[in-house]
């Protein structure tokens, strides 16, 4: 009889929301039968609501009705599937406890992002110690305490949330970021015919990204052209102002097919350069996405990146929030195209070794063994993705 995991929650699907699809792919590659019990998440509305705290009560009330719909179908789904474990995907803060009360199987919560970290420390929407900040910390703690196991994306983030909540360290685990849309093959890296390095940035422009640091660095290096997809409106204006013809400002969002075209046309992909503590703890999805596409990356020098990629030869680093150091690295790379070509040739192999589907499957086996050791103790055989 196969091992079964039920995904239950209100997560987002589609372009821009790879996390839950990644986790499902990893489970399936580990030989797990996966079922779902889901209502739609908030999607891109989350970004607007985060910036407008006065909308939080109404958003909570609307989500409450979705939660009731979800719970109405959960009992029947559990009876049908009889899961050996339940995963509550991100965002699931408001669902973990209620789901846990309604299922007999152990429950894992893919926290992915701390509410406190996102709103207080990274985006600085409210001050530490304020009523809202304290409430967000309480939300994080309540959600984590309800789950049998809490999953983050890096060991550094797992340690951060453990410290924030004060819960035992053995309640936390990590599953790496992974590209669920990685193509089976990559386009060969082509050296620039005009000597101009094509640098690609894509992202929402949250403080973690440090986009203005990147723009200021590119302004100092005449041999770099920036293609900018996303970013906040003031950052897009700033890029046009200081870079002129050396920037192509694209849409605020592109689908996966267009993003792949942009990756194929790039020589180097920009990661994150922000000054918040969160920068030190993440391996950004854009880094993983770029490596999967066979493109080298430049990003902030952080413990999280160094843990996996120090010495890999495919990721180049600069000091976080330091446009001067970043400019020096860009200048060096634009003058050493052979090094970039070599890095590009190795990038997909590095992705496969550290972030590929089989690596995620192996991590899942370890996590499931912790979650339900009696059921999953025999599930460590090799499985082909």
State where each predicted segment sits:
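Acidic anion/phosphate-binding donor-loop and adjacent secondary structure
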Residues: 32, 171-172, 178-196, 210
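Membrane-proximal helix-turn-helix segments that form the acceptor-binding/catalytic region
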Residues: 130-150
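Carbohydrate-associated surface elements
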Residues: 156, 177-178
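A charged, aromatic-enriched C-terminal amphipathic alpha-helix characteristic of glycosyltransferases
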Residues: 188, 335-369
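Conserved donor-binding/catalytic core segment of Leloir-type glycosyltransferases
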Residues: 190-209, 215-221, 226-227
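Nucleotide-activated donor-binding/catalytic signature segment of Leloir-type glycosyltransferases, i.e.
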Residues: 196, 236-268
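Nucleotide-sugar-dependent
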Residues: 209, 253-262, 267-289, 299-307
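Conserved acidic donor-binding segment of nucleotide-sugar-dependent glycosyltransferases
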Residues: 311-324, 332-338
């Amino acid at each position: 009889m196969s091992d079964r995991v039920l995904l239950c929650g209100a997560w987002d699907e589609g372009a821009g929301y790879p996390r839950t699809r990644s986790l499902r792919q990893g489970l399936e590659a580990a030989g797990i039968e996966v079922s779902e019990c889901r209502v739609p998440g908030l999607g891109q509305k989350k970004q607007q609501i985060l910036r407008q705290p006065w909308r939080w009560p109404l958003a909570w009330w609307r989500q409450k009705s979705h939660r009731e719909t979800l719970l109405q179908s959960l009992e029947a789904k559990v009876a049908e599937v009889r899961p050996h474990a339940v995963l509550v995907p991100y965002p699931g803060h408001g669902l973990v406890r209620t789901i846990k009360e309604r299922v007999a199987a152990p429950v894992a919560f893919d926290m992915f992002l701390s509410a406190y970290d996102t709103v207080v420390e990274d985006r600085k929407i409210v001050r530490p110690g304020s009523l809202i900040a304290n409430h967000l910390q309480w939300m994080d703690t309540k959600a984590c305490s309800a789950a049998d196991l809490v999953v983050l994306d890096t060991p550094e983030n797992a340690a951060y949330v453990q410290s924030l909540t004060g819960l035992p360290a053995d309640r936390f685990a990590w599953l790496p970021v992974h590209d669920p849309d990685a193509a089976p093959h990559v386009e060969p890296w082509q050296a620039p015919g005009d000597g101009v390095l094509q640098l690609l940035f894509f992202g929402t422009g949250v403080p973690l990204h440090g986009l203005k640091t990147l723009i200021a660095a590119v302004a100092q290096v005449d041999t770099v052209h920036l293609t900018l997809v996303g970013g906040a409106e003031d950052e897009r204006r700033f890029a046009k102002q200081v870079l002129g013809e050396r920037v192509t400002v694209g849409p605020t969002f592109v689908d996966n097919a267009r993003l792949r075209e942009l990756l194929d046309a790039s020589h180097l992909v920009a990661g994150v350069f922000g000054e918040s503590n969160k920068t030190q703890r993440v391996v950004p999805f854009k880094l993983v996405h770029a490596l999967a596409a066979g493109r080298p990356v430049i990003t902030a020098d952080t413990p999280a990146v160094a843990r996996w990629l120090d010495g890999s030869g495919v990721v180049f680093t600069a000091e976080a929030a330091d446009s001067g150091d970043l400019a020096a690295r860009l200048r060096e790379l634009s003058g050493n195209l052979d090094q970039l070509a070599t890095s590009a040739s190795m990038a997909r192999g590095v992705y496969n070794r550290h972030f590929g589907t089989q690596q995620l499957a192996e991590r899942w086996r370890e996590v499931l063994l912790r979650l339900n050791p009696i059921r999953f103790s025999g599930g460590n055989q090799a499985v082909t993705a």
